[in-house]
Amino acid sequence: MLKPPLPLRSLLFLQLPLLGVGLNPKFLTPSGNEDIGGKPGTGGDFFLTSTPAGTLDVSTLPLPKVQCFVFNVEYMNCTWNSSSEPQPNNLTLHYGYRNFNGDDKLQECGHYLFSEGITSGCWFGKKEIRLYETFVVQLQDPREHRKQPKQMLKLQDLVIPWAPENLTLRNLSEFQLELSWSNRYLDHCLEHLVQYRSDRDRSWTEQSVDHRHSFSLPSVDAQKLYTFRVRSRYNPLCGSAQHWSDWSYPIHWGSNTSKENIENPENPSLFALEAVLIPLGSMGLIVSLICVYCWLERTMPRIPTLKNLEDLVTEYQGNFSAWSGVSKGLAESLQPDYSERLCHVSEIPPKGGEGPGGSPCSQHSPYWAPPCYTLKPEP
């Protein structure tokens, strides 16, 4: 059988999707006996071999780009594989600095960073950082013998400083505050952004500060609680960095604050101590009051009301102790434990010659008066 001409074969190949052969999840791979030139007798037909979607060969993926950041000019991290795509094997990073002749002498990274057992970055110490020289990096796949095109980076544009520290507030006048802070890098190479708001504001107010490490707020209200925070960036005098540092710890001033709170804006240990002691003290006071109330209920008799006086006669038959609620032991302790003897005294008319000072117990008549007795408690 003669083969159809080459244009006709191409037309048939383009019509395969119309015949129900799906080419989207398939790749055309040569079988090893194909004839690109169309010579007869060499088996120039292609076989369709399918590869399931989602199981792409990582060797066909492009190498990821390298992203570098210099942290406070103390160390540098260059990372890759920031996307969710699978990484082709363990990649190696080669770096160097471009000289005046344009000759890039690259060397391999000495301190790799790993993620799930696969290289994901390279760490550089302070001595390896040349801030104002062109930094050259190249990512390579040693197994597939592939290389990424060289990347040229300006490290002065990739500096991220540390967050400002030691925020301090002081009063310049009755209604004016000054906020100051410090950085762990040269102040003339940093610009700052100050944010502040009161407890009655919903949004932050921003103020840019260049080359200085202080900020003045001319008008404040002592009845409000103010919050301040600062962040820094490498300024255009030393570089063109676009990344800000992290925000500093906030500092507060205003109502419900004191001088100690301004100097030490946050004291977690004191806050935790107050949060524990105040509830415990309140609960202890409540329990003590309940105990005192119960003790008084048991020891103090109830005071009867006037409307219950009828019960003293009708229900208790005049028994005051039972009606008043006095305990039996208390009633017995109130009764006397002695008896009185009567002393019979009789008056004898005085005789003549007797003065008024005669004793009433003197015997001036033939009748004897009963003896007099004094009150003595019974033994």
UniProtKB/Swiss-Prot annotation:
Superkingdom of origin: Eukaryota
Localisation per UniProt entry: Cell membrane; Cell surface
CDD domains assigned to the protein according to its UniProt record, in alphabetical order: FN3 (cd00063)
Topology in the lipid bilayer: Single-pass type I membrane protein
PROSITE patterns listed in its UniProt record: FN3 (PS50853), HEMATOPO_REC_S_F1 (PS01355)
Glycosylation sites: N77, N81, N90, N166, N171
Ranges where the record places region Disordered: 349-370
Residues with PTM Phosphothreonine: T305
Role summary: Common subunit for the receptors for a variety of interleukins. Probably in association with IL15RA, involved in the stimulation of neutrophil phagocytosis by IL15.
Protein name as it appears in the record: Cytokine receptor common subunit gamma
Record organism: Bos taurus
Upper lineage: Eukaryota, Metazoa, Chordata, Craniata, Vertebrata
Gene from which the chain derives: IL2RG
